[in-house]
Amino acid sequence: MIKEKNNLSLTKSILLILISISIAVGGQILLKIGMNRMGNIAVNSMSSLGHLFLGVVKSPMVLVGLFMYVISAAIWLVVISAVDLSFAYPFIGLTYVLILIVSKFILKEDVNPIRWAGAAIITIGVVVISRG
């Protein structure tokens, strides 16, 4: 499960995985907030692509969200250099759970019981896979 070349302990590996996931979730939330401020964008022509690009460049929320993705990816590269991908990757499922929680409590989105049940199943799945 853990490769010796980078000498990461299991605890440190899991911590880095969770940090990477949390930063990615934070980035996704900032992207959503930034895009909500921009409004709906219909990409049906080159001019609308230009409008999207200009909107992104002018939006601090979107730019910071994208930067957070870069940081998350850098941490992820450290993780997968040290642990098996089959161990690390299932933790990505926790992004769905965290997005659900943050969407409910920060973005004030409606989350129905079926989604909560799905989040519970995902969490159980990640725990089972990580112990295997």
Across the structure, where does each feature detected by a protein language model lie?
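Polytopic alpha-helical membrane proteins, predominantly small-molecule transporters/carriers
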Residues: 2-132
